[in-house]
Amino acid sequence: MRQKRVLSVLLILLFLVSQAKGQDYKYLESTGAASGISLSAGIENPVSVKVIYDNYVKVEGMKEDWGYSIYIEGLDKEILFDTGTKPEVFESNFKKLGIDADKIDFLILSHEHGDHTGGIPAFVKMRKGIPVIIPQSFSEKFKKEMSGSGLVPLLVSKPAMICNNLWTSGEFEYQIPEQTLVLNTKKGLVVMTGCSHPGIIEMLKKIRTDFNRNIYMVFGGFHLMQKSDKEMDTIITEMKALGVVKCGATHCTGDRQIKMFREAFGDNYFELGVGNTLVIH
C-alpha cells in the first residue's frame, strides 16, 4: 500500500515537472546583429497597409475603439499585425474593409496586452492553422491559448526575416516583451510599432544598429501620453536625428503628442485611423 502511495506521488511530481517545462515551441530562424543582417535593395512594388483597429476613425461607417491592428499586403506573404481589443469590433471592420482572411499567411503580435490580442477569437473563426509570431517571453498561458485556438506559435528572440523585405525586430528586453515590424525599402527602413513600451527612441536606435540602415519612416503607437512638451521636443529631435523623414502616430501616443508630431513633420506626417490605407513605395 505504501509503495502504491509513493508511486502515485512520484507520478504526480513527474506530471507537474513536465507541465512546468511547458511545450516545446518552434522559433522563427534568427539573424542576429552579430552574424550580420543581409538586406536587399528594398521592395520593388508598393506595399499597402490598412488600419483595421484604432481609437481614431478615418473612414465613415467604420468602428473606432481603443486598440490597434493593421493588415499588410503587397509582399510575397500577407500579414495581420495585432488584432485590437474587442472581437466584434475587429470582425466588423475586417469585413467592411473587404479583407480575405484566407490570404493571410501570418498573424504577428507586438505584445501580450489585450488591446492588441483581444480580437483573436474573431480572427480564428475566419482563419486557423497559420503561424502566430510572438516574442519568446510571452507567458506560457498565452502560448497554450494560441495553440488551443488553432494557431501555431512561432517564437522570436532576435531579428528574423518573415518574408522578402519584411523582418521582425526581435524581442526588446523590457518588462513588457515587445517586437516591431521592419520593412526594407529603397529609401530606408520603415518601422511599424504596436505600443512601443520599451521606448520609441530606444527601439529605433536598436533597429538602426541591428540593421545598419537609416530609418526612413515610423508609424503606430508610441506610448507617449504622459510625456511633457519638453520631453516631446527631445523625442522628436532624436527621431529626426535617426533619419526619420515620415511619421504617423496613433493609438497610445496621446492626442496632444500626436498634434506635436503633426506640427513637427508637416507634410511628411500622415494620419492613420480605422479605414485608412497607407501605401509605401
Predicted regions mapped to residue ranges:
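Active-site metal-binding motif and surrounding structural segment of the metallo-beta-lactamase
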Residues: 88-133, 209-218, 237-240
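Bacterial N-terminal signal peptides that target proteins for export
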Residues: 1-7
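Zn-dependent metallo-beta-lactamase
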Residues: 19-75, 158-171
